[in-house]
Amino acid sequence: MSNSMLDKNKAILTGGGALLLGLIVLFYLAYRPKAEVLQGFLEAREYSVSSKVPGRIEKVFVKKGDHIKKGDLVFSISSPELEAKLAQAEAGHKAAKALSDEVKRGSRDETINSARDVWQAAKSQATLAKETYKRVQDLYDNGVASLQKRDEAYAAYESTKYNESAAYQKYKMALGGASSESKIAAKAKESAALGQVNEVESYLKDVKATAPIDGEVSNVLLSGGELSPKGFPVVLMIDLKDSWLKISVPEKYLNEFKVGKEFEGYIPALKKSTKFRVKYLSVMGDFATWKATNNSNTYDMKSYEVEAIPLEELENFRVGMSVLVTIKP
């Protein structure tokens, strides 16, 4: 065989080998397991600044994007109705306190003196009636007075004796003042009236709403002059220091997202990668179930909601930024 034929065969073998190798590489690249990218979003804790008092908003002191400190004044409410209720509650408390003081102090000196005089008069009447009865009894024993006269004298004596006892009891009541039960009841009414004053005052303090945290104003829902219902969120705030990643994870990748496990995510908007730690996971509803297309090698997969906290402070991040998490094969 000539050298030319050998060279030709050699070239064919080399070309065939290269072609075969290329086919093998293409087959590998086509069918090798591919990395999957899951997309989640950054979220932050949101707070509503509202008031327990319904009324007309007097002024809103912040606007979207403002960074404010805890305790800063956010908005104020004008409530003339509440001020009227406070005046009413204070008047009720003054009346209840005056009544309680009167009961505690006891009867006036004039009342005590009057009760004593009535008792002394009844006592004198009883003494006179007793002496009269004794005289009539002696006359009756001697046959001078009739039985009727004696009975009348005795009845008069008994009546004046009971009148004296009743007058003495009233005198004792005047000396002792009100009963302990009356004093307790009057004091309780005073405390209840004071409680109403304190309740209205606490509501009045809430007409000036302050920031519950250090954070950023994310939205202002009402403006000055508008009516605000009780508990309505007038201003929304977010705490950018309390942020987390929320991501939907198919069931087959749950092993990569155990609670406490760390993983890396890429934030395209910030052009940086950062570490996250899983703090919570929970199954999502049936709407998030991945349905199998056949019954041979696949199954219906649930999706799980995973929340993970960043392990470093994210500068310049905004709520809603995407985070890409790559699952390696």
Swiss-Prot record:
Result when mutating T274A: In strain: Hp921023
Protein name (database record): 36 kDa antigen
Membrane topology field: Single-pass membrane protein
Keyword Membrane belongs to the record: yes
Similarity-based family: Belongs to the membrane fusion protein (MFP) (TC 8.A.1) family.
Pfam families per UniProt: HlyD_D23
Organism the protein comes from: Helicobacter pylori (strain ATCC 700392 / 26695)
Transmembrane segments: 11-31
Alphabetic keyword roster: Membrane, Transmembrane, Transmembrane helix
